[in-house]
Amino acid sequence: MITLLEFVLQNLLFIGLHLDCRSSFPKQLSKAEERECIEKIAAGDAEARNVLIEHNLRFVAYIVNKNYPESIRGSQQDADDLISIGTIGLIRAAETFDYSKGSHFSTYASRCIDNAITHQRKHIRQFQ
């Protein structure tokens, strides 16, 4: 009876902690917030750049899961590496995006993220 009680209490604690953490990534910015960040970045605001990057980390994980499922099935280390490399592409996108050209940031960022991952994978294959 005590072990059953311990089991129930442990699971309640786990559920409580899980609900408290909600998400490992910040919520995505609204279109207005995103545009405001992009305008501030164009004016040289480093804090706006960091906010834009942090709020698009979930997008990097989505692209890795969608475009590189073989790496996700391989090991968590492979997935973490691809997300890290994809984040470098996201940083590049945040620094070079031009809103006046009419495209959405997510469209531009997806290409930058994918290019960073593809470039790194080609570089690794050269040394194998």
Put a short name on every predicted segment.
Residues 4-127:
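Alpha-helical promoter-recognition and RNA polymerase-docking modules of transcription initiation factors
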